[in-house]
From Swiss-Prot:
Keywords for the protein's UniProt record, in alphabetical order: Lyase
Alphabetical list of CDD domains matching this protein: PCD_DCoH_subfamily_a
PANTHER family, per database record: PTERIN-4-ALPHA-CARBINOLAMINE DEHYDRATASE-RELATED
MF terms (GO), sorted A to Z: 4-alpha-hydroxytetrahydrobiopterin dehydratase activity
NADP among keywords: no
Provenance organism: Pseudomonas fluorescens (strain ATCC BAA-477 / NRRL B-23932 / Pf-5)
Top-rank EC class of the record's enzyme: lyase
Family recorded in the similarity comment: Belongs to the pterin-4-alpha-carbinolamine dehydratase family.
UniProt xrefs under Pfam families: Pterin_4a
Protein name: Putative pterin-4-alpha-carbinolamine dehydratase
């Protein structure tokens, strides 16, 4: 199996399957610092990234925008002073798809080289 951070997203339609109960623990183990949150009955992956100031947080947000556009899969991004909260879920299936785990792993890769991390 390809490492999540090297995989690419596939097109996700409204009839695509959500991650199964069997797949979930296998996938979450590959992104151990991410939390599973449930909002309005929708399972999501979420992680907070800390930065030294707003400028660095904004640069990380913009970098996330670039990889999201390239993969055609977009997160919820909350940019605050010194902090960016990244939330992944698949809107079309109202839950988690393998794409969300791929992008969470790719987010961690971007964060490794992000300037100004705390």
């Amino acid at each position: 199996m390809t490492a999540l951070n090297q995989a690419h997203c596939e097109a996700c339609r409204a009839d695509a399957p959500q991650v199964s109960d069997e797949e979930l623990p296998v996938l979450i183990k590959q992104i151990p610092d991410w939390n599973i949150e449930v909002r309005d009955g929708v399972m999501q992956l979420e992680k907070v990234f800390l930065f030294k100031n707003f400028k660095f947080a904004l640069a990380f947000t913009n970098a996330m925008g670039e990889i999201s556009e390239a993969e055609g899969h977009h997160p919820g991004l909350l940019t605050e002073w010194g902090k960016v909260t990244v939330t992944w879920w698949s809107h079309s299936i109202k839950g988690l798809h393998r794409n969300d785990f791929i992008m969470a792993a790719r987010t961690d890769e971007v964060a490794k080289t992000a300037e100004g991390r705390k």
